[in-house]
Amino acid sequence: LTSWGRGDWVPVKSHSSKELTSSVYFYVDTKILANAAKMFNKTEDYKYYSALANKIKNAINDKFLNRETGIYGSGVQTEQSVPLQWGIVPEELKRKVARNLAKQVEAAGFHLDVGVLGAKAILNALSENGEAETAYKLAAQDTYPSWGCWIANGATTLLENWDLNATRDISDNHMMFGEIGGWFYKGLGGIFPDPENPGFKHILLRPNFPSGLNEFEARYQSPYGEICSKWERKKNRIVYHVTVPANSTATFYAPDNVKGERAVNLEAGKHILELPIKRAVY
């Protein structure tokens, strides 16, 4: 484990363990090295960095994860979301950890309580682990602290500080809170590359259809051409339009609130899927 780094820079109010967040990024960097070694057929390097990554992950979970409660560290938003985003959480505990994260967001009135590291992780951590409704409410929030609060107060760039009245850390053109832009493509449009088929040769489609949002469209220019993921709500169903570029294929994975098939393989071309929505239970 390591405590090197600046930690969750410019948080709203809650402070996260720097050892937890820095160690997660130590793991991420080690995984990158392992994957690169595999690509370049550096077998010994691949074995070394894979073993090191596994050792780091186990050390993080041994020290910070309460397996009974599904809480990392003190359970604040960043400490729950960063391990989810970067693949630290054991598979069988992902939904429990995500539910705890959603509870934290709900308790904050669907407002952020994160700095730079949590802002990178929180929307993905929610929407990719069964909590897309909470992710959307968080992304659509327009009162302090939120991305929308900046817009409501006239900002046209990404700021360095959630607090518009801050007297330090006040850059008016700072990319560090910018993950929400990518999340629109991933969390709502569901457009992901397939790690086994780089460059969008094969496309993974994992859109979410949160209540309160009736239509959405994302277009992405891949090396093979434009990918389009567009959906609209029609009473008790979603009409989902997909464009798969030439020489590519795709697999659509249905979110939890859709009835029927969980995965559909799609060839190149334009497709329309009629997706019945499950009735919400409160």
Where do the protein language model's features map onto the residues?
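The feature captures the catalytic groove of carbohydrate-active enzymes
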Residues: L1-N54, N58-L112, V116-N124
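Repeat-solenoid scaffold signature
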Residues: A107-S146, N153
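Non-catalytic C-terminal accessory modules of carbohydrate-active enzymes
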Residues: A37, A51, E133-Y282
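Alpha-helix initiation and capping sites
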Residues: Q77, V116, N129, H174-G178
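Generic preference for well-ordered secondary structure
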Residues: V10, R67, E106, F110, ...
